[in-house]
């Protein structure tokens, strides 16, 4: 860990999960514990998605909010000693709700909390916030592929 005000920098995040530009949505991790993570995604107008979603009314797609939450969860899962270097996948998304749109300039706080973990399968509650307000909530089912090794 570097001398930083963050629990993990973007560089440290890239040592844990395989996502890279243009599909890397974690700028840094604010806090991480055994079963909970809080990460940050700075939404900027320079993101490729805003070229088409939507011209004149740029809106960060809901599916990418879910992907951002999933990436935060992957960090939490793959930081566990027994899963380091493995791959984590979404097995299901339930009860997804989108409460308000996310636009360029927003700072999304991504909270992912594991509620059940048995073997290599688990469940988690996830919430994205902007300015302290919930913008998206959902429940994830996740699976760790212990046979898969990340390419470095």
Where do the protein language model's features map onto the residues?
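Active-site helix/loop of acyl-thioester processing domains in fatty-acid/polyketide metabolism
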Residues: 29, 60-83
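Small/polar/charged residue-enriched interaction surfaces, especially the RNA/DNA-contacting tracks
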Residues: 6, 19, 39-42, 144
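HotDog/MaoC-like acyl-thioester-processing domains
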Residues: 3-5, 36, 102-106, 113-152
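Hydrophobic beta-strand-centered segment that forms part of the acyl-chain substrate-binding groove
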Residues: 2-7, 73-109, 135-143
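N-terminal leader/capping segments at the start of a protein or of a new domain
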Residues: 1-26, 31
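Catalytic strand-loop segment that frames the active site of acyl-thioester-processing enzymes
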Residues: 21-60
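Conserved positions in beta-strands of structured domains
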Residues: 27-30, 94, 99, 113-115
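Short, hydrophobic/aromatic-enriched beta-strand segments in well-ordered soluble domains
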Residues: 41, 111-114
